[in-house]
From Swiss-Prot:
EC nos: 3.1.-.-
Protein's name in the database: Endoribonuclease YbeY
UniProt key word Transferase: no
Record key words, sorted: Cytoplasm, Endonuclease, Hydrolase, Metal-binding, Nuclease, Ribosome biogenesis, rRNA processing, Zinc
Cofactor(s) named in the record: Zn(2+)
Similarity comment text for this entry: Belongs to the endoribonuclease YbeY family.
Subcellular localization: Cytoplasm
Family matches, as InterPro entries: MetalPrtase_cat_dom_sf_prd, YbeY, YbeY_CS
GO molecular function terms attached to this record: metalloendopeptidase activity; RNA endonuclease activity; zinc ion binding
GO CC aspect terms: cytoplasm
Superkingdom to which the source organism belongs: Bacteria
Gene3D superfamilies given in the database record: Metalloproteases ('zincins'), catalytic domain
The keyword rRNA processing is assigned to this record: yes
Length: 156
């Protein structure tokens, strides 16, 4: 039986109200990697817009903060480490998107963790067929976690 994911939770956001608990982050990440039968270590860093903006500009060339950035750990094949990678989640963007999309805040936090973990596992949504596969898997995982389909909400 899987023990779960080991989470290194770093909260550097000034406002730390309404954040999920460490146990919730672990539950959501574990659900996302369960299909791969992994028990990895993942760093989840909760940041403010300035750090998200800087990282998004540096690594993606996008001049704005974003909800979640995924940085897969690239380990040489001969080295076996359980590190999967890092997720950087922007508190303000997640809160704003949840409100704009009419989603419960915990559901959107869970979705961002699941979405980011799938990126760490190599899933992407650049091409249409990739997006369909990834979104289908996200919906399945979110449903297993007791949340609604994250793509069923309309923007307000």
């Amino acid at each position: 039986m899987m023990k779960g994911v080991i989470i290194d939770l770093q909260i550097v956001s000034e406002d730390q109200t309404n954040l999920p608990t460490p146990e919730q982050f672990t539950q959501w990440a574990t659900a996302a990697v369960r299909a791969e039968a992994l028990e990895p270590e993942i760093t989840i860093r909760i940041v403010d817009e300035a750090e998200s903006h800087d990282l998004n500009l540096t690594y993606r060339g996008k001049d704005r903060p974003t909800n979640v950035l995924s940085f897969p750990f690239e380990c040489p094949e001969e080295v076996e480490l359980p590190l999967l990678g890092d997720l950087v989640i922007c508190r303000q963007v997640v809160e704003r998107e949840a409100e704009q999309q009419g989603k419960p805040l915990p559901a959107h936090w869970a979705h961002m963790v699941v979405h980011g973990c799938l990126h760490l596992l190599g899933y992407d949504h650049i091409e249409d067929d990739e997006a369909v596969e990834m979104e289908s898997l996200e919906t399945q995982i979110m449903t297993e976690l007791g949340f609604e389909d994250p793509y069923s909400y309309d923007e307000i």
